[in-house]
Amino acid sequence: MHVIDSHTGGEPTRVILSGGPHLGSGPLSERAARLARESRAFYRSVMLEPRGQPAMVGALLVEPVDPDCITGVIFFDAEAVLGMCGHGTIGLTVTLAHMGRIRAGTHKIETPVGIVEVCLSDANTVTITNIESRRVHRARQVDVDGFGPVTGDVAYGGNWFFIVDPSPIPIERTNIRALSDAALAIRTAVIANGIGGEEGQPIDHVIFYEMSPRSAVHSRSFVFCPDGTYDRSPCGTGSSARLACLAAEGLLNAGEEIIQESVIGSTYRLSYQPGPNGGVIPKITGQAHVMAESTLHFHTDDPYRNGICHAPQ
C-alpha cells in the first residue's frame, strides 16, 4: 500500500494512493458508507499502531463524481469514517502539490458531504472554503458525572460537535489527560440525553474553548475526536462549527478574520461568508508539511497486521 504522510499544525494525515479497498462507483456518501460497513479492518490496520499513530487521519483517494474535481476523498480515523476533515484536506492538498499533481491556484475536492474548494498559495499553505456550516442547538445543558451541569452548543461543520465555552479545565498541554477525560464524560452525557443533530445525528466530537494569552489570537481550543484522541491542530471542521456559533451570536461579522489556536499552539486563520441556507461558508487557512512517503506491508504471519487495539472494541 503506497502512502504519503503529512502533518497540518501537528495533526497527521496519511493519504492512501494505492492498495486500498475498491468501493465501486456512485455518490461518495454511498462509497463512504460502504467503507464503514465492509472495510473496518482496512482503516484500523492503517491507522492503529504499529503502522499508524494516535490522532492520525487517513485520506483514501477515490474517483470523483464531479469531473471538475481534482480528486474524491474519503476520510477516516481508527474508529470511524468521517464526513469531512479540515486538517486532512489541507494535508491532502499539500500532498498533491508535492506529487506534482496540482500547482498553486484554486481547485475542487469532492468529499462525502459535498465539494470543498481549496486554494494552494505556496508549497505548504492552503485555504479551504468548506461546506455550509450551522448551529442547530444553543446552550443545551447536561449533567456530567464529576462536573455537574455543563452547557454547550451543537453545531455542524462537516462533523458534529458539542461546543463548550469556557472550558471546564484550563487548556494547557499539561492538562491533556484531564481535558480528554472531561470531554469523554461530556460526550457520554450528551449521547445519553439524546442530544444530536436535526435528525438525531450522533455527536462524536467535543470542543472546549477559552481565551488565549496571545493578544493576536481569538481563542484557544481543545478538540476531542471520535477515537478518543485529541486534535493537535485547531480542527478545520470544528473551526467551521465554531464560526457558525460565533455568527449566530453576532460575535463575528462576515469577512472578519480571526486566529484560532490549538492546545499545542498551532494556528488557523478563520473567516466566513453567509451561506444560502442560513448558515455560514467558512474559510480556513493553515499549513501542512509532507513527512514521509512509504509502502505499507501486511504479511499474513504478522500477529499485528490488523493493528494494536489498546481497548476492547
UniProtKB/Swiss-Prot annotation:
Q: Which residues cross the membrane?
A: none
Stretch list, region Disordered:
1-23
Q: Which residues bind substrate?
A: G86, H87, H205, D231, G236, T237
**EC number from the UniProt entry:** 5.1.1.8
Q: What class of enzyme is it?
A: isomerase
Q: Which domain of life is it from?
A: Bacteria
- Tell me which UniProt keywords the record has, alphabetically: Isomerase, Plasmid
Gene3D superfamilies cross-referenced by the UniProt entry: Diaminopimelate Epimerase, Chain A, domain 1 (3.10.310.10)
> Could you state a single Gene Ontology molecular function term?
4-hydroxyproline epimerase activity
List the InterPro entries hit by this protein, alphabetically: Pro_racemase_fam (IPR008794)
* Catalytic reaction equation(s): trans-4-hydroxy-L-proline = cis-4-hydroxy-D-proline
What residues sit in the active site? C85 (proton acceptor), C235 (proton donor)
The similarity annotation says:
Belongs to the proline racemase family.
PANTHER family per record: TRANS-3-HYDROXY-L-PROLINE DEHYDRATASE
The free-text function statement in the UniProt record for this protein reads: Catalyzes the epimerization of trans-4-hydroxy-L-proline (t4LHyp) to cis-4-hydroxy-D-proline (c4DHyp). Is likely involved in a degradation pathway that converts t4LHyp to alpha-ketoglutarate. Displays no proline racemase activity.
Q: Can you say what this protein is called? A: 4-hydroxyproline 2-epimerase
